[in-house]
């Protein structure tokens, strides 16, 4: 049993097979970069650049098909396999009569299946890009104006979007299992070769090539590097399957013996978060508040401003990373919960409404951030206009009172004016002329003097 899994005599060289696969990928990428540079050259017409930008995936598919025709279809070996002195053959032939002939080449059926795998990869990427172009709110089928075909299409897209991630995880797990099996047995480096039962053998057996002679080359460094690469790929495969927040919550609840905290916002927190300005992300503020042990006075609002705003179901704005992480956590934890359970969805910190999706804030970001400032400026302008109107009314009232006083006491007004005129005349004749003041009673003794008339006048001699 151990000898069958790990043969000791002339074991299959795993490093050559992996190097051949890496070389094929590098050659394909290098040719595609050169093709892209040719289409985007300034010496060529601009419509060629538009063709490349609109049909980049199709051009890459044509390049891969051309490489497949020149190498695998014609020579039963890719360019990387040829450099490593390897060739593909059909490992599923059990008839001894045709085994020697069939082991030197691939059958047409296997070539067609390999070609189909190339086309399948293209169509899978196209379907993924099309499905992920729809947001969750675009797939709602509650509208009354939708036709039957439109409802079926949206339901199909929604089903594919929910199952694509599961299929990707299953493919990653199968690839990991196949890779571990390849390290043990030395055959089938990927899933395609295992499904089609395609094996590799030396291309030239009559001469000893440097790359295919295991007796003259020490693979100690390659084997050590292969182990580290395997551990790295294992970590890359296993980390996306682990839900760190869910594992942390379950661990804390099991240690402390307490039930998970409700997703609803308390009344005290709701008062704090609802009073925050619109330009502040409530989730960032909550994280800063928790990290500072509740020292709210030490938290600067400028450090918790909204970055890359996204709008939730209730219409409030949060940071893209903050709201997406919250929705993703509750989406994974609430899979098995009924819709009536309040912990199935994350609740908005500002209004305590459940949020099931988020989308890009399509409005002007500055409008949302300046709305409160504009309202405050408008209130200040209204208050200042009211004060100005009040001052105008006070000044008009004082003017009316002054005019009434002068109208009633006309004699006093005339007397004051007469005295002012006398002072002006006195100042005018101070250049040496004699100024004499006559008493009205001495000059006009025979005339009756009115008591209300002025008692003196000024005359110049």
Curated annotation (Swiss-Prot):
Residue intervals annotated with topology Peroxisomal matrix: 1-13, 78-101, 186-218
Alphabetized UniProt keyword annotations: Membrane, Metal-binding, Peroxisome, Peroxisome biogenesis, Protein transport, Transferase, Transmembrane, Transmembrane helix, Transport, Ubl conjugation pathway, Zinc, Zinc-finger
GO biological process: peroxisome organization; protein import into peroxisome matrix, receptor recycling; protein ubiquitination
Organism, as annotated: Komagataella pastoris
Assembly behavior: Component of the peroxisomal translocation complex, composed of at least PEX3, PEX2, PEX10 and PEX12.
Single GO cellular component term: peroxisomal membrane
Spans traversing the lipid bilayer: 14-40, 52-77, 102-139, 152-185, 219-242
Bilayer topology term: Multi-pass membrane protein
Superkingdom of the organism of origin: Eukaryota
Gene coding for it: PEX2
Biased composition (Acidic residues): 376-387, 440-453
Disordered: annotated span: 374-408, 440-461
All ranges on the Cytoplasmic side of the membrane: 41-51, 140-151, 243-461
PANTHER family: PEROXISOME ASSEMBLY PROTEIN 10, PEROXISOME BIOGENESIS FACTOR 2
Family recorded in the similarity comment: Belongs to the pex2/pex10/pex12 family.
Top class in the EC scheme: transferase
Function: E3 ubiquitin-protein ligase component of the peroxisomal translocation complex. The two types of peroxisomal matrix targeting signals, PTS1 and PTS2, are first recognized in the cytosol by their receptors PEX5 and PEX7, respectively, which then carry the cargo to the peroxisomal membrane. The peroxisomal targeting signal (PTS) receptor-cargo complexes interact with peroxisomal membrane protein (PMP) components of the docking complex.
Entry binding sites for Zn(2+) 1: 281, 284, 319, 322
Protein name in UniProt: Peroxisomal biogenesis factor 2
Major localization listed first in the record, in broad terms: membrane
Catalytic activity, reaction form: [E2 ubiquitin-conjugating enzyme]-S-ubiquitinyl-L-cysteine + [acceptor protein]-L-cysteine = [E2 ubiquitin-conjugating enzyme]-L-cysteine + [acceptor protein]-S-ubiquitinyl-L-cysteine
Biased composition (Basic and acidic residues): 388-397
